[in-house]
């Protein structure tokens, strides 16, 4: 189980170019929350996730982790965060096995070969573990990146379209993992154009905060 945490959004507004996407977004995400950020294309879902991950600045307002602004505790905050965006962070010259082994080394104190074999099976890459990532399809590269989720010890997961290029079975496996992470006291925030098959899922629609 994770310690209790809270991610607070305080009066957030977001601007892209000359256009304000949303205004006055205030809410809390607490340990155990599994939340889908909804809204039409262009409303600012990815922009919001980047703000929450500390990769972009809001027009107004601030993001707080356990009551302190993330801008004042960047290193500690990022130790508690796993962010997966559209850039996968997969090293193309490394094999699927080597990429997962690299993720394990940076996220876990102990190296466990059996865990990596089990993980290759979970992400559907058994038999392709020795191929360089550059030779794999976009969907297979996405699976390598998603392997980080099973290795992560961070309580806060921020995931931008994690189901893209993933088949129905893969979506079910990932959703079960997200449910489990939340039940252990983690926080999962994601965007998705697909239905998320979870009875624990909460939703936040940015349309309610759309700028006039």
Swiss-Prot record:
Residues that coordinate or bind ATP: 39-46
Cellular compartments per GO CC: plasma membrane
Source organism, top-level taxon: Bacteria
Topology in membrane: Peripheral membrane protein
One Pfam family, short name: ABC_tran
Known EC number: 7.6.2.5
Catalytic activity: heme b(in) + ATP + H2O = heme b(out) + ADP + phosphate + H(+)
Primary role: Part of the ABC transporter complex CcmAB involved in the biogenesis of c-type cytochromes; once thought to export heme, this seems not to be the case, but its exact role is uncertain. Responsible for energy coupling to the transport system.
Name assigned to this protein: Cytochrome c biogenesis ATP-binding export protein CcmA
Lineage: Bacteria, Pseudomonadati, Pseudomonadota, Gammaproteobacteria, Pasteurellales
Gene: ccmA
